[in-house]
């Protein structure tokens, strides 16, 4: 039975007030005193990390139990930050959330845990969006981590859906939770990013066009037309499975488990 889970949030300086509101929602509505909250603070592209903002993040963490901040001094891809949350958490199951999320359902955490324990699903979206999804360390290593060649943000979710369909024959399942949704605050974004639509970086779109080609016999994922992957993926964190298999041997050594 799964009863331990980590919540991970990616944020940046323009979203500070949203982050504060979200933490208050998590604390008051869900009650996460026994749940680790990993906050990954991203730098803005080609900007210095403001020290006053960094200090405020540390103050937020200091004022609450079980909050673990990871602060990036420069901009990193959303794919890398999602991977980082999953790798750095101490639980197999992880809830990944955006910082512009509204949570008005006090039973959200129980609903998620009940769904996990009744279905055994290791990778699923909530309300059909990657603004909020659940993933395990195990499935991410098996399927392959989010592709960090998408060096900005956007397209990494559609890429993962495509790879899930390729490997398992279907896209990941979805869990519906009422009063739980992304507010889509695209107005609060970094300025030094060339975009193509909805403030999504052009670079990731162009890389997606290299990685996939239109194909009438291809896969329908998040793309409006069927596509086929033409650029190979590779295991970005090859030794994570080795660590997961052997970490109990650090305190009381039995044997090295090779994978």
Language-model regions, residue ranges each:
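Cell-envelope/extracellular polymer assembly enzymes that use nucleotide-activated donors
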Residues: 4-6, 36, 159
């Amino acid at each position: 039975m799964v009863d331990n889970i980590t919540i991970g949030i990616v944020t940046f300086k323009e979203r500070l007030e949203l982050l504060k509101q979200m933490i208050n929602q998590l604390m008051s509505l869900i009650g996460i005193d026994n749940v680790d909250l990993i906050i990954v603070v991203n730098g803005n592209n080609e900007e210095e990390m403001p020290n006053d903002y960094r200090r405020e993040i540390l103050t937020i963490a200091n004022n609450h139990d079980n909050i673990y901040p990871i602060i990036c001094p420069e901009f990193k891809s959303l794919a890398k930050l999602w991977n980082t949350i999953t790798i750095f958490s101490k639980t197999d199951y992880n809830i990944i959330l955006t910082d512009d999320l509204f949570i008005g359902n006090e039973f959200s955490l129980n609903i998620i845990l009940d769904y996990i324990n009744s279905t055994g699903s290791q990778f699923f979206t909530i309300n059909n969006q990657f603004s909020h999804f659940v993933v395990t360390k195990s499935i991410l290593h098996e399927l392959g981590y989010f592709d960090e060649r998408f060096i900005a943000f956007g397209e990494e979710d559609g890429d993962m859906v495509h790879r899930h369909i390729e490997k398992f024959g279907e896209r990941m399942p979805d869990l519906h939770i009422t009063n739980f949704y992304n507010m889509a605050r695209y107005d609060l974004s970094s300025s030094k990013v060339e975009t193509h639509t909805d403030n999504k970086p052009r670079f990731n779109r162009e890389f997606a066009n290299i990685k996939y080609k239109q194909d009438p016999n291809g896969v329908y994922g998040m793309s409006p037309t069927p596509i086929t992957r033409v650029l190979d993926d590779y295991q970005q964190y090859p030794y994570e499975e080795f660590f997961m298999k052997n970490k109990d041997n650090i305190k009381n050594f039995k044997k090295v488990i090779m994978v």
